[in-house]
């Protein structure tokens, strides 16, 4: 890295600090000592590790504490748990870009925005070739909650030394419909996050084995795609032109699709180096599920704000639907048979998400009729940004 690049990264780090300072204090503000105490005294974490299978080592909790203690925190409002998540994701993306010969320009300052809003963002840093890439604390929590709800909803069946997952929408919906805990999970996923206090009001749940293994794959897929999407904006210099002008960007929609396609391509490049590629990621199923669920949080919030449209009974938001359909036309050199299978997987998962929200929508309308208002939430925000 040249002296110029090093100086630009320092400017980007300071710019990220200024972005963090825009947010008021919230219940997610924690010091490193607070987080370490939480890890040491949390039996739920030991229970979680036990769900990862016979090969899961009890030492993982001790290793987590050591890693958290060693995690550098560039800015005053960084906290080690979420910052380390984003740090590892960004390191993975940057390493893949270097191997693939994708220029990272002046570099990226990354971290977590201290808010329960659902945001994944890239900010161009003026006068430099750098960007700030951030996931919000709320977004990280939402991905975790979504991975639990979806993994637990998919029927799992042992097949020798492996697991068979039944992703057929009818079977997934049957499982959800027959389990009150699963129904509550999905109700909270859209409702609590739309209301604005998802991370505060959603109880910490431990997904049992073997669903926990699927949950980890889904969580990884949601987070890695989101970060890769923001890096795509940085690589393509999206934001640099807008910062010099006024008004909206007429090419915003096409830029989002471009970023989605870059992200899925880079994620496939990363996964092809592993022995067992993450099927939820390489198929594009997890990315489209994430896009749809963010859209449904937006729709649920509209209900709580009294701005619901009775016609919106499925995910027909033009931008979201256009982005979801773009995955069908981007085969990225994948063999035709595999591309068809990937498309079927995406469509099956989309059908599940559409059906779940359609069934929950009347309940959210009833909540509004009973007096629930989004303005009543002390941490209300406009959720659902992945752009």
Predicted regions and their residues:
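Short active-site segment of divalent metal-dependent hydrolases/proteases
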Residues: 228, 232-236
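Peri-catalytic and regulatory segments of divalent metal-dependent proteins
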Residues: 31-224, 236-239
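Alpha-helical scaffolds flanking conserved acidic
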Residues: 213-225, 253, 277-285
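A structural signal for well-ordered alpha-helical segments within the folded catalytic domains
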Residues: 87, 221-222, 229, 257, ...
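Long, well-structured alpha-helical subdomains associated
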Residues: 1-35, 40, 268-387
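Solvent-exposed alpha-helix faces
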Residues: 264-265
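Divalent metal-coordination and catalytic microenvironments
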Residues: 135, 259, 319
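Post-HEXXH active-site segment of zinc metalloproteases
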Residues: 236-261
């Amino acid at each position: 890295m040249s002296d110029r690049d090093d100086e630009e990264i320092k400017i980007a780090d300071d710019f990220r600090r200024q972005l963090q300072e825009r947010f008021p204090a919230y219940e997610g503000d924690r010091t490193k000592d607070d987080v370490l105490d939480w890890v040491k005294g949390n039996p739920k974490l030991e229970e979680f590790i036990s769900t990862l299978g016979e090969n899961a080592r009890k030492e993982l909790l001790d290793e987590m504490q050591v890693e958290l203690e060693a995690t550098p925190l560039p800015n005053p409002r960084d906290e080690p748990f979420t910052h380390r998540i984003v740090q590892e994701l960004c390191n993975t993306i940057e390493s893949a870009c270097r191997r693939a010969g994708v220029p990272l320009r002046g570099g990226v300052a990354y971290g977590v925005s201290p808010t329960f809003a659902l945001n994944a963002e890239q900010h161009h840093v003026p006068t430099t070739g750098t960007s700030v890439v951030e996931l919000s604390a709320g977004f990280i929590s939402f991905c975790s909650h979504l991975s639990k709800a979806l993994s637990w909803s998919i029927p799992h069946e042992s097949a020798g030394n492996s697991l068979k997952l039944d992703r057929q929408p009818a079977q997934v919906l049957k499982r959800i419909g027959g389990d009150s805990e699963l129904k509550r999970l999905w109700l909270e996923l859209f409702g609590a996050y739309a209301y604005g206090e998802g991370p505060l009001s959603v109880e910490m749940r431990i997904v049992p084995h073997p669903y926990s293994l699927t949950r980890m794959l889904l969580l990884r897929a949601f987070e890695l795609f989101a970060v890769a999407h923001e890096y795509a904006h940085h690589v393509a210099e999206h934001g640099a032109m807008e910062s010099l002008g006024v008004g909206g960007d007429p090419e915003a929609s096409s830029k989002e699709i471009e970023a989605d396609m870059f992200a899925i391509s880079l994620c496939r490049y990363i996964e092809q180096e592993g022995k067992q590629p993450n099927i939820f990621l390489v198929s594009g199923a997890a990315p489209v599920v994430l896009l749809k669920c963010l859209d449904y949080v937006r729709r649920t919030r509209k209900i709580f704000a009294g701005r619901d449209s009775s016609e919106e009974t499925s995910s027909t938001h033009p931008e979201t639907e256009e982005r979801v359909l773009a995955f069908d036309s981007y085969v990225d050199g994948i063999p035709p048979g595999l591309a068809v299978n990937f498309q079927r997987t995406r469509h099956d998962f989309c059908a599940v998400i559409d059906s779940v929200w359609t069934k929950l929508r009347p309940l959210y309308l009833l909540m509004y009729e009973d007096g629930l208002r989004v303005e009543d939430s002390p941490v209300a925000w406009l959720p659902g940004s992945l752009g």
